[in-house]
Amino acid sequence: MVSVQTIATIVVKTFKIVLNIIILVLYRTGYNGEFLGVGGTWNLNEEKNPDAEIVASGVIVGYLIYTLVQIVTFLFGTTEHKRALSEIVMNFVGVFLWIAVGAVALHYWGGYQGEHQFQFVFAEKQVGLAVGALCVINGAIYLLDTALSVIHFTKEM
């Protein structure tokens, strides 16, 4: 019999995958079909920081792959993966990484000024703020998944 925690975990992981794909598409094509990025420079008159972009790309793509692998293991129906401490650690670290990437994006795009300095609404700014907000929301979902992972881990002990 499948437990309620297992079903909840599969639903949460599926939602994380969908949200992660949305973030990835916006991150990659949010600037009128071109690369949007998260910014990551503290001087808003400069170009985007490549270090922040590398970390953001790693978090977005890395956690997409990790979550896909985790959901595949759940779909196999075995219980071995539920006893693994690695899922708790990865989800816990994911909370901080997603919130950090979202905070950098919100900081950069919140102060963004486009080419026309007296225009206040820019499509890329709105998409950048959406990416930042979605990353923070994804961090909260990873916190929920961390709690579910702890429940699985303690229940199986």
UniProtKB/Swiss-Prot annotation:
Record field: transmembrane? 7-27, 54-74, 88-108, 131-151
- Provide the membrane topology annotation: Multi-pass membrane protein
Q: In which tissues is it expressed?
A: Expressed in midgut epithelium (at protein level).
**GO CC annotation:** apicolateral plasma membrane; septate junction
Localization: Apicolateral cell membrane; Cell junction, Septate junction
Q: Which UniProt keywords apply?
A: Cell junction, Cell membrane, Membrane, Transmembrane, Transmembrane helix
Oxidoreductase is among the record's keywords: no
Source species, domain of life: Eukaryota
Q: Which GO terms describe its biological process?
A: septate junction assembly
The stretches that face the Extracellular side, renumbered to this chain, are: 28-53, 109-130
Topological domains annotated Cytoplasmic? 2-6, 75-87, 152-157
Q: Report the PANTHER family cross-referenced here.
A: PROTEIN SNAKESKIN
Q: What does this protein do?
A: Required for assembly of smooth septate junctions (sSJs). May be important for barrier function of the midgut epithelium.
**What is the designated name of this protein?**
Protein snakeskin
Native source organism of the sequence: Bombyx mori (Silk moth)
